Curated annotation (Swiss-Prot):
It catalyses: tRNA(Ala) + L-alanine + ATP = L-alanyl-tRNA(Ala) + AMP + diphosphate. One of its GO terms (cellular component) is cytoplasm. It holds the Pfam family tRNA_SAD. It is found in: Cytoplasm. Its EC number is 6.1.1.7. It comes from Sulfurisphaera tokodaii (strain DSM 16993 / JCM 10545 / NBRC 100140 / 7). This is Alanine--tRNA ligase. Its cofactor is Zn(2+).
Length: 904
């Protein structure tokens, strides 16, 4: 821990209430307690869990009851209850998951840019942390992938103090003593230090009976160049473990029994795993503080201690606790999976989707280890039913959640079918490092223990070990958003540097999005880059391309604006040539209105389509990218499979309904905190803008999201919409391309021209294409059937009609078949006998294409190499190869014979 002045922790509250500062005899950490005899900090591993033996006044509390008791207590103490945010941190551009309650307020509230939604406030925030995923179950409840962090926060400004350390500690004491009924002498405040996100401060860990029930952090420093600089905004950042409070009051054998109640027994039953004795579990839990997950040997030692204490066989204890831990892992993981999917996660091979897929696959792997063939979605369904009142989004998105989990299980099974092939390719190595295993999992998703098992069947000597915390290592690599590559700037560096010393450009396009022309004064001229004091030219941003148009000077010179770009708040007009202008000159500007108007249509319709897609496909749909040009619009959305034609029609019809319904479209400038509280984090579908205020585009009773682009004032101006292309561009991302307004007519004409050309090729009219095509396909089918009959006849005679020769005990068949399907079947049939080679030679221009197939007991490698030495190009290995050569047929055959004579 950082060396901190003792006065940071020497609070008036402690001194006035007869608390003593002690040094733990085990860990040497200072802590505060009213118990004068206490010499140990009451935290694991300094002690075992002994809260089971403490007498408290509170009745057993479920998770829901513990949550409500906490919220209501702090509401009585003047805190405003605010709703939690989703478990996907979409208001953050650097983080995928909500890992703590303070994340809800980062970066804008904590940096002082915007005020908090209330001050002080209280909430219970569901959180997900995956770096300790391998420890879940093994520690019987100390580690969970999903948990609720109940928290009260106070934001202290220089001119407005709410409360600080003394009040925070006193509130915790009152909650634990008055609401939970813990004897005050059992409370311990362990001195600690917190750092995260560039901030730091002293903290207290509240420990009782071996269990850490809360952490009280006082965020008061900013870390700059390794130094601690006092913050102007000082934040009380607390975290109370809701699940731990429930366990503390229920005193169940493990935390999982307290969190999940009867669902524990349901899971054992459905998985087909025999129940584990409660006394064994409770003893294991009491001693679980001795487990250090970073030291796997402590797990073995823990089980030895449990066996000794109960007088049981170690093998039996190990077997029982392993089974229990695995069932608890499935319990934990399925809840986390349900919460992730309910908040809109789409499993994929990147981003937040990667973390979701990792957890699904880990749950599936654990089920295999338990020998269970139950479908994972059946267990997730149980979680939805159990938690539906606490998290209504689970029930609302139930169909999506179950559909995705089922699909992911199918994909996982497909992945496992490739394990032998992957193992074979890796078995030639002498060693596989942990980093290699992580990279392999990233690329193919095969559980490392299964992969290593297969590799060792082929190469028992290979050096490879799967670390105990493998999945945690993988999760850690993916838990934060990688730093985005520096955007490929469209402006040269000298122009970007120029912007540093220029004033912001007034944005006339926000005052009136229909404004076509304007007058302005020149602020800067550099080469063909022009900066004005104000402009109606929209600079490229948010997927909308920059405006073009003209600029005229007072002398009558006209300059074409070929592009518009922005550096921070300075707008650059890129001209077709260097202008004869100087600072202070007045100019006239006019945008290419037809072009801009088409872009506006494609931009507004993008918002219409996104909302339509969410309504048709589900609330998990999120914008993954977009582009708006005069020619068309493009929207990339998160979705787990390619939409059906019926779904695309529904999206298109719904969007056209909104267009024809003449919905008003208006921009709103609103405080960020107010916007989030009123509309939720979906306002960030197009990205997270900076600043205290956000600009929203509202389509009446349809859609509202943050956007800095130019828009129509009514959906009717869009005219019409046609989706022209739908494709899967990457795992979990679907691309929609569409046209709007008068571009729809252009697109229709192009399609009409294609139809006319097709009808011309079929010698019929456009009206008769369907009839003609049907007849054509029937004729094609008849001819295909006839061709198949000829193929069968040829195959029956292939051995007789091919040139056959025996060389060095090997039978060589020389054939010349142009029909690809017939050729493949012939080569397969002729190589069924041992020691046989088939050579198909076909002419292609000035070259001969040679295909070679061998029976399973021979290889083509040497033959291919011999033909390559003669100038051939191609390759092959095993039983098949192909090469292109200028050799004539006789020379090809002789080269092959010679190679066989020398032995292949």
């Amino acid at each position: 821990m950082v060396q901190v002045n003792e006065n940071e922790y020497r609070l008036k509250f402690f001194l006035n209430n007869n608390y003593n500062r002690k040094i733990c005899q085990v860990c040497q950490t200072p802590f505060w307690t009213k118990d004068k005899e206490r010499n140990v900090c009451a935290d694991i591993p300094c002690t075992d869990y002994y809260f089971f033996d403490l007498n408290i006044k509170s009745p057993p509390l479920t998770v829901r009851e513990a949550r409500q008791k906490f919220l209501k207590f702090f509401e009585k103490k003047g805190h405003t209850i605010i709703p939690p945010k989703p478990v996907l941190a979409r208001w953050r551009e650097d983080l995928y998951l909500t890992i703590a309650s303070i994340v809800d307020f980062q970066p804008f509230v904590t940096s002082g840019i915007v005020p908090p939604p209330a001050n002080p406030l209280v909430l219970s925030q569901p959180c997900i942390r995956l770096e300790d995923v391998d420890n879940v179950g093994v520690t019987f409840g100390r580690h969970l992938t999903t948990f609720e962090m109940a928290a009260h926060h106070a934001f202290n400004y220089p001119d407005k103090q709410i409360y600080w350390k003394d009040e925070t500690v006193e509130l915790s004491k009152e909650f634990f003593v008055e609401e939970i009924g813990i004897p005050e002498e059992e409370l311990n405040y362990k001195e600690s230090w917190w750092e995260g996100g560039g901030n730091a401060g002293p903290s207290f860990e509240v420990t009782v009976g071996g269990l850490e029930l809360a952490t009280l952090v006082f965020m008061q420093y900013e870390i700059k160049d390794g130094n601690y600089v006092p913050l102007k905004l000082k934040i009380v950042d607390t975290g109370y473990g809701v699940e731990r409070i429930a366990w503390f009051t229920q005193k169940t054998p493990t935390a999982f029994h307290a969190i999940y109640g009867n669902l524990v027994y349901t899971f054992f039953n459905k998985i087909g795993a025999p129940l584990v004795d409660d006394e064994l579990l409770k003893t294991a839990a009491i001693l679980a503080g001795r487990i250090d997950p970073d030291k796997p040997e402590t797990i073995k030692r823990h089980r030895e201690e449990v066996a000794k204490k109960l007088g049981l066989d170690l093998k039996y204890v190990d077997q029982e606790l392993t089974r229990a831990a695995r069932v608890f892992q499935v319990l934990d993981h399925t809840k986390t999976i349900a919460l992730m999917l309910a908040d809109g996660l789409v499993p994929s091979n990147s981003g937040e989707g990667y973390l979701g897929r990792l957890l699904i696959r880990r749950a599936l792997r654990v089920l295999r280890l338990l020998g269970s063939d139950i479908k994972l979605y059946e267990l997730v369904k149980e979680q939805i039913e159990y938690w539906k009142e606490d998290f209504p989004q689970l029930l609302k998105n139930k169909d999506y959640i179950l559909d995705v989990v089922n699909l992911e299980q199918e994909r996982f099974n497909e992945t496992l079918s490739k394990i032998s092939l992957t193992a074979s390719s890796l078995s030639r190595r002498k060693e596989i490092s942990v980093d290699d295993l992580v990279k392999l999992y990233d690329s193919n998703g095969i559980p490392p223990d299964l992969l290593v098992e297969e590799i060792r069947k082929i190469n028992p000597e290979i050096k490879v070990e799967v670390p105990y915390n493998f999945y945690g290592l993988v999760a850690k690599r993916h838990q934060t958003v990688p730093l985005k590559d520096t955007k490929k700037e469209k402006l040269p560096k000298d122009v970007i540097d120029l912007a540093e010393n220029l004033p912001p450009t007034k944005k006339l396009y926000y005052e009136d999005q229909y404004k076509r022309s304007f007058t302005a004064k020149v602020v800067s001229v550099y080469k063909n880059y022009l900066v004005l004091d104000q402009t109606t030219f929209y600079p490229e941003g948010g997927g909308q391309i920059g405006d073009t148009g003209i600029i005229k000077d007072e002398k009558g010179n006209t300059y074409q604006v070929v592009d518009t770009q922005k550096v921070k708040d300075v707008i650059f007009h890129i001209l077709d040539k260097e202008p004869s202008l100087k600072e202070g000159d007045e100019v006239y500007g006019e945008i290419d209105w037809q072009r801009r108007y088409r872009i506006m249509k494609h931009h507004t319709v993008t918002h219409v389509i996104l909302s339509a897609a969410r309504k048709v496909l589900g609330e998990h749909v999120w914008q993954a990218g977009a582009e708006k040009t005069p020619q068309k619009g493009r929207l990339d959305i998160t979705h787990y499979k390619l939409p059906t034609e019926e779904e695309i029609k529904k999206i298109e019809d719904l969007a056209n309904y909104i267009i024809n319904d003449r919905r008003s479209v208006r921009p709103l400038i609103i405080n960020r905190t107010e916007a989030e509280m009123k509309y939720g984090v979906s306002i960030y579908a197009g990205g997270v803008p900076e600043g205290a205020d956000v600009r929203l585009i509202e389509i009446k009773d349809w859609d509202i999201e943050g956007c800095g682009g130019t828009h129509l004032s009514n959906t009717s101006e869009i005219g019409a919409l046609k989706i022209i292309n739908v494709e899967k561009i990457q795992d979990g991302v679907i691309r929609l391309e569409y046209v709007a307004g008068d571009v729809v007519a252009q697109y229709a004409r192009q399609e009409e021209d294609k139809l006319k050309e097709i009808s011309r090729q079929l010698s019929t009219s456009p009206e008769q294409i369907e009839v003609r095509l049907k007849r054509f396909l029937e004729e094609y089918k008849e001819k295909e059937e006839l061709l198949n009959q000829y193929r069968k006849m040829m195959l029956q005679e292939i051995e007789n009609i091919s040139k056959k020769e025996t060389v060095n005990g090997v039978t060589i068949y020389i054939i010349n078949l142009f029909d690809e399907e017939l050729r493949k079947e012939a080569m397969r049939k002729l190589t069924m006998n041992q020691k046989s080679i088939v050579v198909n030679i076909s002419n292609k221009g000035n070259n001969n294409v040679v295909e070679i197939a061998t029976s399973n007991d021979l290889r083509v490698d040497k033959i291919i190499e011999a033909l390559r030495r003669e100038g051939g190009k191609g390759g092959g290995k095993g039983t098949y190869g192909s090469i292109t050569t200028q050799l004539n047929v006789d020379k090809i055959v002789n080269t092959i014979k010679s190679t066989i004579n020398n032995g292949i």
